[in-house]
Amino acid sequence: MVLTNSKQPRKQRKALYNAPLHLRNSVMSAMLSKALKEKYGKNALPVKKGDTVKVLRGSFKGIEGEVSKVNYSGYKIIVEGVVNKKQDGKETPYPIHPSNVMITKMEDSDEKRFKTSNK
């Protein structure tokens, strides 16, 4: 899926900013683990709530957890176990871009997802 044909960064950013929600799904793709790549024949698939992912980049590198929320408007996902500690001791979820995670286990209740991934 191509949001724009331009190479200019400003137009790329604008296309992402103005993209409709139904096109943002493909931008929210994450790399698959080796086992899932062999099983589905794809390198990446969109992240869904319930998937188990491993963080590959950033200060939370190495943490594995379940996706509890997918924010299409902000292009971020919330992973259980990836939290910021506030000054008063409370923990707040830390949003991560899907390109910085790897899907290790997929949530399997959606049959359409597997039909499209087996093409």
Swiss-Prot record:
- A Pfam family this chain is assigned to: Ribosomal_L26
Alphabetically, which GO biological process terms does the record hold?
translation
What GO MF terms are annotated? rRNA binding; structural constituent of ribosome
Q: Which InterPro entries match?
A: KOW (IPR005824), Rib_uL2_dom2 (IPR014722), Ribosomal_uL24_CS (IPR005825), Ribosomal_uL24_euk/arc (IPR005756), Ribosomal_uL24_KOW (IPR041988), Translation_prot_SH3-like_sf (IPR008991)
Taken from the UniProt entry, a GO cellular component term is: large ribosomal subunit
Give UniProt keywords alphabetically: Ribonucleoprotein, Ribosomal protein, RNA-binding, rRNA-binding
**Which PROSITE patterns is this protein grouped with?**
RIBOSOMAL_L24
Q: Which Gene3D superfamilies match?
A: 2.30.30.30
Q: What does this protein do?
A: One of two assembly initiator proteins, it binds directly to the 5'-end of the 23S rRNA, where it nucleates assembly of the 50S subunit.
Q: Which family does it belong to?
A: Belongs to the universal ribosomal protein uL24 family.
On assembly, the entry states:
Part of the 50S ribosomal subunit.
Question: What name does the UniProt record give this protein?
Answer: Large ribosomal subunit protein uL24
Q: Which gene encodes it?
A: rpl24
